[in-house]
């Protein structure tokens, strides 16, 4: 173990330590120190020893950087592990890749930036662009930060005039640093050997680990990339100075770049020539792109200039435009063929713009004119165009709008027609609403009048047999009747007839209800049934309240007629049976040779057991029949006929009495009316047919030659009178 503070005074070791100190100063940006004599080279640990089987944590050795190219520690990337890694493309431009997200970017991520870079990244960089002049007097622009050169003037950037060639001093310093890189590498290898020998002579001190061959290869590749980048910077600087162009060959370019220290960074001429040719290809492509962009920008500027120029009209010709804009820089910057194409496009644009503006003005005038018409109450749906024009000239609102005075007449007429149509539509809607209101009012009046009729019907004053003349004194005193007189449509009499007709149509239903009531009560209508008794039967039932009294009377008359008809039929049947028995009884008397001298007391014992005798009801009838037969058969027949005639006369009187009391059934009344209508229609049809036949015959006939004119004229008059 060496004691603390022990130092080696070997001159070789001191020299090696000085070289190492120089390299460290270059790496960390520290000022050089004169000597490290009397300073211990290594501080040995006193109470901790690294186990042989455990590798001591070491920091990777610094990259071999030539003098003058040292990287300040504050500018280097942080030592913390990151997902980002730095790479370079074929041109030597660095780019960054994230192995997790697979994202690639030209911009350095914040993770890889040093604290100084982070602090200055948000600050604006002023004066990046400088303007220089080429040998032929053409201006070009150089960025002092990105080392970019272009012909197109950058927009929105502050540009300063370049007084000296850009990056001259920096190029010299960097070139010197790169030139010394090879020598520094050799010195560094000697230092490593000396350090290894010194540490090997020390017992119990582990030797530093050998550098891996892969790291050495990476350092050499990185150094080669930096050397190539410096050589390309040389070419860019000379290009920006106008010394070389993309049309120069290698021999022409060497004359201008061989005196620069950066030219000697690369030893092989083939490498320099290869880099020069690659730079020519890349720069030629950039020049073409810049030229294309410059031409495109010039075209865009010219197009924008022409579109906004007030003299650009749809009718402007190219020759006239060339005379107007011949002195404009934007016009001169574009060749004639492109100018013509841009001019045609601008003419189309101006025509389209003017058309759109004209359409917008037209729509604005139409809307304004429509607003003026809507605000004028004098213009109605009846107003004509001539009247509207006179009213408009007197309107102050229209007089203030001078632009409307020059409005297209056809558009103005169209707007007026639309306004009139809208006014007519509104008028029709108002009229329809008023008509609906009147109809509702009239309907309410009719409904009130109908309620009046229904109230009369419920009281029994209005029935299906009621007459207008009988109820008019009652109806006319009501105000609802008076309201009906002041409105159009159906009159009070019409509604009365409709109501009565509805009651008559209800007769079938009322008749059915009456029959159901009589069946449920077990009542039967006979010829002697009184109407009061019949009405009590119906009204006393719960269903009887729905039956109309007039229909009840008609139904009563119908049932009475049926009962009387049934009684007549029974009487006729009885009379026929009686005549048949009398006939059989006469035959019986004839068999016993009864004559006018015969006595009933003598004949009776002889025939009392006979069927014809027994069929007679009593002895009075038998004796009467015997007397009739004894007096003669003709007398008997004549007596029965006289009885029948008397009965017929009685029946006729009853029918006439019922017809006087309006007791005829509705069915008989309707049948009579139908018969009358059929009879009248048949007679009318026959008369029409006869008249038609006569007229046809009169047209076909012609007066005979033998007839005199006077006779033919009399016939014609007679036919005309018959036709009339």
Swiss-Prot record:
Pfam families: FF (PF01846), FF_PRPF40A (PF25432), WW (PF00397)
SUPFAM superfamilies for this protein: FF domain, WW domain
Annotated region (Disordered), positions in chain: 626-724
GO MF terms held by the record: RNA binding
Sequence ranges assigned to domain FF in this UniProt record: 224-282, 295-349, 353-422, 442-502, 507-562, 578-632
Keyword flag Repeat: yes
UniProt domain WW: residue ranges: 78-111, 123-156
Database matches in InterPro entries: FF_domain, FF_domain_sf, Prp40-like, WW_dom, WW_dom_sf
UniProt entry keywords in alphabetical sequence: Repeat
Biased composition, class Basic and acidic residues, residue ranges: 681-692
Biased composition (Polar residues): 630-639
GO biological processes: mRNA cis splicing, via spliceosome; mRNA splicing, via spliceosome
Protein name: WW domain-containing protein ZK1098.1
